[in-house]
Amino acid sequence: MAINRVYTRDFWTDVSSVNRIVWVKPVVIPYIDTDDELAAILSHSIAHGVDSYEGILRGYISILNYWVAPNKYDLKADKTAVDYMVNADYNPLALITILNKIGKQYRYDVFSNHTLVSRRMMLIYEYIYTKYPNVLVDNDYKDNIYYQNFLLTSRKNRMKLLEKIQTNSKNKIRYSY
């Protein structure tokens, strides 16, 4: 699939699910410090576009799924974005750092249908840890303040992941925030 162009757009949501156009919010651009972080944003948006394009009427109907249950599709797009980044030789940890910079944490929002950013970052970390462990060994982000913040605030969750791996458990981990 070819992407026609990348635009910036002032709009309340990212729309990359129809017409093969990737939109990037202008408010995000000042937070991008590296090519890896730009690749993270684009990979996530492209993953949404690719996922929705395979639907009825070329994806026009599947956009309703995103509005009804965005949580499921964001988590799938996060994993696909990691795969895209690794295949394109970008550091997938940038997805964690950019989410740490721009992600809003709706901790007490009972009506939110989005996964908490802290949980999303941990699920991305778990996916990288299990599928691409060599990325974590000696990475360029080890001194990055946003990655360090993630490591500091996710210590208990990373211990849960370590316990799951050591016990060979197949159970899903309920990460705290």
What role is predicted for each listed range?
Residues L42-D51, K76, T80:
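Active-site His/Glu-centered metal-binding helix of metallohydrolases
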Residues N4-Y7, P26-V27, S43-S45, I98-L99:
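Active-site-proximal beta-strand/loop segments in catalytic clefts of secreted hydrolases
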Residues V18-R20, D36-A39:
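Envelope-exposed proteins and targeting segments
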Residues M1-R20:
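Catalytic zinc-binding patch centered on the HExxH motif and its immediate surroundings
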Residues V28-E37, S45-I61, A88-Y90:
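Catalytic Zn2+-binding segment of zinc metalloproteases
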